[in-house]
């Protein structure tokens, strides 16, 4: 794991880029960060840029500078001589994910707390399980050829309200008593109110299968990892 402040040239200078046959870049957000390392990279190094579904043209307007910056980096890579590959995940969910979207819903439902949603909650979003993202990263990392591949790593499309209802099914019966209210709060909602859908023909983890597996993990270790109380 390469660690340091990628915004500082002196930290970038400490990296022996020639020592790496493959680099998976998960924290490149700004074009200025790209400029700091691109000339230091070996052109034959298998470089995988983790972009975002927000970089797709029909969704960029909903994600402000984040989507635009990711898109610009994609364009810079295409102009470069690097051996690049690009991954665009949708909303990542699942075991160990650093943003516990499903865990957030599980915790709220278990404690019978209200859940904030954006808009009426009927917008359709796409969720992909972290295992699927990892599998695609491994595949690309072991493909040294210059494929210049760009892949949208996605899963099932579902209305936000339906996603919450499906999570509800996997909360154990010994949860707290009471009702769970859905409250419109665009700022606190963990999923925005715009549609965010994708289509794919690759073999991904289906939502029901992934939720069932996630719930077991959540009760065994996930809640503790995220600091939630069951």
Q: Model-found features: residue ranges?
A:
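NAD(P)H-binding glycine-rich loop region in Rossmannoid oxidoreductase-like domains
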Residues: 1-44, 54-60
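Flexible, glycine-rich beta-alpha linker
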Residues: 87-105, 124
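Mid/C-terminal beta-alpha module of Rossmann-like enzyme folds, strongest
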Residues: 139-193, 212, 224-230
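Alpha-helical substrate-binding/gating segment
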Residues: 106-116, 123-158, 172
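Conserved Rossmann-fold NAD(P)-dependent oxidoreductase catalytic core, especially the SDR/UDP-sugar
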Residues: 34-80, 84-88
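Residue-level signal for the nucleotide or nucleotide-sugar donor/cofactor binding architecture
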Residues: 68, 128, 158, 202-206
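Hydrophobic/aromatic beta-strand patches that form the interior of the parallel beta-sheet core
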Residues: 2, 24, 46-48, 85-87, ...
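Conserved sequence/active-site signature of Rossmann-fold short-chain dehydrogenase/reductase
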Residues: 55, 92-93, 133, 158
């Amino acid at each position: 794991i390469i660690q340091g402040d990628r915004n500082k040239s002196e930290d970038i200078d400490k990296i022996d880029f020639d020592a790496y046959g493959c680099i998976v870049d998960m924290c490149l957000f700004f074009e200025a960060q790209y400029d700091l390392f691109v000339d230091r990279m070996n052109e034959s190094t298998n470089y995988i840029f983790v972009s975002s579904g927000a970089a797709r043209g029909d969704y960029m307007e909903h994600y402000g500078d984040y989507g635009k910056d990711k898109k610009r980096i994609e364009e810079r890579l295409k102009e470069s001589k690097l051996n690049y590959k690009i991954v665009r995940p949708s909303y990542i969910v699942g075991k160990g994910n650093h943003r516990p979207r499903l865990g957030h819903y599980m915790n709220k439902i278990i404690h019978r707390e209200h859940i904030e949603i954006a808009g009426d909650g009927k917008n359709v979003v796409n969720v992909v399980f972290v295992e699927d993202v990892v599998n695609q990263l491994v595949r690309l990392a072991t493909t040294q050829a210059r494929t210049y591949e760009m892949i949208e790593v996605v899963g099932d499309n579902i209305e936000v309200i339906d996603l919450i209802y499906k999570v509800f099914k996997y909360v154990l019966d010994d949860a707290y008593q009471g009702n769970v209210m859905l409250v419109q709060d665009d700022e606190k909602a963990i999923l925005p109110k715009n549609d965010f859908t994708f289509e794919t023909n690759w073999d991904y983890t289906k939502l029901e299968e992934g939720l069932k597996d996630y719930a077991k993990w959540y009760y065994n270790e996930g809640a503790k990892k995220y600091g939630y109380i069951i």
